[in-house]
Amino acid sequence: MIEILENKNNETDKNLKSITLKNSNEKIAEIKIANTFFSRLMGLMFKKNGKVQVLFEIPEKINKKERSSIHSFFMRFEIVLVFIDKSNAVYEISELKPWNYYVPKKPAKYIVEFDRREFNDCLKIGDEIEIK
């Protein structure tokens, strides 16, 4: 079981809520939540590195019409995309080079965007995510 814990103070970005992704023993990643149109649009674009990862909350109305596609335009590094379904399970993991586009196999409830250099196989297909 992977837990997502809300952080009380957000030092990484004053405009985005920060959470910590952890398993039972250790912190996996510091994650920003992208839950507005603009924050979902920006993701990790224009960043020099991906020391802080991004969790996209996909609105249900988008999920019904589209397939939670992701692009890496204006990215300076490769990313790993982790797709989480409505039962909070990781169902797909994909790598994406800069200036590419990816459409997952099915709609996602959440997508986590990692800098590939920071990912370290910290999540696997079938992992269940618990948000606290």
Locate each region found by the language model.
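Compact, glycine-rich, soluble single-domain proteins
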Residues: I2-K132
